[in-house]
């Protein structure tokens, strides 16, 4: 059974709350490090579930090219800032975060009020700057998903004129790199390898959890292959043995036994294999001596007939 160690040799949290971890996996046989690294990287980058802002509503705004009175950023800039929010939602439904801010103020992600199902990772992420005497009223729609989801112009939410859709990037892992290092020589002189895997997340998930989720996805993907059973193709029958194809003439039977079998439509050994000793005795003019002769001839080529017929 394959056995190896998994060590986390480095772990850091950046100022923007993104997290990075470095894992060393080994020892592995030659080629296994690349196999593991490639499969894990693909799942980590595109297969993990994450949380993203999918739509924004701004009071008094009905299209993305508008401006908000008293707000330094135009609507496009506000949408781009909302796209940078890093959130973690435990709900399967769409969650809504709201804020109402009076100027002067610098509006950040921490000003958004969500239910207890959603937490804001990068609370310092800027959203907008509101001047004195003005206000900004805004809500964001948050969903869980996998990969990248472009704006759906035909969706129900898109029909609402004041709800501005955003291309959603759900991927919680930002970057994955791996290298393969050769280590000591194993049994039989074969080279051994170690996989060095670096995982960088947006902070909504730890590198340890990301690695565990990716591994479980791969296990679920490969598990059905462990119980594959190949169905037989319909219509296929086992090929008859060479002995069963021997013609009756080659058994060197007596003339009496040969003629009786021929009259009973027995032309080869394969025809005889459907008979028992009792069946042979029922052939017209076929006595015990002829039956014994047939049994002996078949035994010489490795075939034996049952004494009595089988009953269902």
UniProtKB/Swiss-Prot annotation:
<dbReference type="InterPro" id="IPR011260">
    <property type="entry name" value="RNAP_asu_C"/>
</dbReference>
<dbReference type="GO" id="GO:0003899">
    <property type="term" value="F:DNA-directed RNA polymerase activity"/>
</dbReference>
<dbReference type="InterPro" id="IPR011262">
    <property type="entry name" value="DNA-dir_RNA_pol_insert"/>
</dbReference>
<dbReference type="GO" id="GO:0046983">
    <property type="term" value="F:protein dimerization activity"/>
</dbReference>
<dbReference type="Pfam" id="PF01193">
    <property type="entry name" value="RNA_pol_L"/>
</dbReference>
<dbReference type="GO" id="GO:0006351">
    <property type="term" value="P:DNA-templated transcription"/>
</dbReference>
<dbReference type="InterPro" id="IPR011773">
    <property type="entry name" value="DNA-dir_RpoA"/>
</dbReference>
<protein>
    <recommendedName>
        <fullName>DNA-directed RNA polymerase subunit alpha</fullName>
        <ecNumber>2.7.7.6</ecNumber>
    </recommendedName>
</protein>
<dbReference type="InterPro" id="IPR036603">
    <property type="entry name" value="RBP11-like"/>
</dbReference>
<dbReference type="Pfam" id="PF01000">
    <property type="entry name" value="RNA_pol_A_bac"/>
</dbReference>
<keyword id="KW-0240">DNA-directed RNA polymerase</keyword>
<dbReference type="InterPro" id="IPR011263">
    <property type="entry name" value="DNA-dir_RNA_pol_RpoA/D/Rpb3"/>
</dbReference>
<dbReference type="GO" id="GO:0005737">
    <property type="term" value="C:cytoplasm"/>
</dbReference>
<dbReference type="InterPro" id="IPR036643">
    <property type="entry name" value="RNApol_insert_sf"/>
</dbReference>
<comment type="similarity">
    <text>Belongs to the RNA polymerase alpha chain family.</text>
</comment>
<dbReference type="GO" id="GO:0003677">
    <property type="term" value="F:DNA binding"/>
</dbReference>
<keyword id="KW-0548">Nucleotidyltransferase</keyword>
<comment type="subunit">
    <text>In cyanobacteria the RNAP catalytic core is composed of 2 alpha, 1 beta, 1 beta', 1 gamma and 1 omega subunit. When a sigma factor is associated with the core the holoenzyme is formed, which can initiate transcription.</text>
</comment>
<feature type="region of interest" description="Alpha N-terminal domain (alpha-NTD)">
    <location>
        <begin position="1"/>
        <end position="229"/>
    </location>
</feature>
<keyword id="KW-0808">Transferase</keyword>
<comment type="function">
    <text>DNA-dependent RNA polymerase catalyzes the transcription of DNA into RNA using the four ribonucleoside triphosphates as substrates.</text>
</comment>
<dbReference type="GO" id="GO:0000428">
    <property type="term" value="C:DNA-directed RNA polymerase complex"/>
</dbReference>
<keyword id="KW-0804">Transcription</keyword>
<dbReference type="Pfam" id="PF03118">
    <property type="entry name" value="RNA_pol_A_CTD"/>
</dbReference>
<feature type="region of interest" description="Alpha C-terminal domain (alpha-CTD)">
    <location>
        <begin position="241"/>
        <end position="312"/>
    </location>
</feature>
């Amino acid at each position: 059974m394959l056995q190896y160690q998994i060590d986390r040799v480095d772990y850091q949290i950046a100022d923007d709350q993104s997290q990075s971890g470095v894992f060393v996996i080994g020892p592995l046989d030659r080629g296994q490090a690349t196999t593991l690294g490639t499969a894990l990287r693909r799942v980590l980058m595109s297969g993990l579930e994450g949380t993203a802002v999918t739509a924004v509503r701004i009071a008094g705004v009905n299209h993305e090219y508008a401006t908000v009175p008293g707000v330094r950023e135009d609507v496009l800039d506000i949408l781009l800032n909302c796209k940078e929010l890093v959130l973690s939602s435990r709900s399967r439904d769409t969650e809504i975060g709201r804020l109402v801010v009076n100027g002067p103020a610098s509006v950040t992600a921490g000003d958004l009020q969500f239910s207890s199902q959603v937490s804001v990772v990068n609370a310092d992420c800027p959203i907008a700057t509101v001047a004195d005497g003005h206000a900004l009223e805004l809500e964001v729609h948050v969903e869980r998903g996998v990969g990248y989801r472009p704006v759906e112009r035909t969706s129900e939410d898109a029909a609402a004129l004041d709800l501005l859709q955003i291309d959603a990037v759900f991927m919680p892992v930002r970057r994955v790199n791996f290298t393969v290092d050769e280590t000591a020589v194993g049994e039989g002189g074969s080279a051994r390898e170690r996989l060095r895997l670096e995982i960088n997340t947006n902070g909504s998930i730890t590198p340890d959890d990301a690695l565990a989720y990716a591994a479980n996805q791969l296990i679920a993907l490969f598990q059905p292959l462990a119980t594959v059973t190949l169905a037989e193709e319909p219509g296929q029958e086992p090929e008859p043995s060479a002995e069963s194809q021997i013609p009756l003439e080659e058994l060197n039977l007596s003339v009496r036994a040969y003629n009786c079998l021929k009259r009973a439509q027995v032309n080869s050994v394969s025809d005889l294999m459907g008979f028992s000793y009792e069946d042979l005795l029922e052939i017209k003019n076929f006595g015990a001596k002829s039956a014994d002769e047939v049994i002996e001839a078949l035994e010489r080529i490795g075939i034996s007939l049952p004494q009595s017929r089988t009953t269902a």
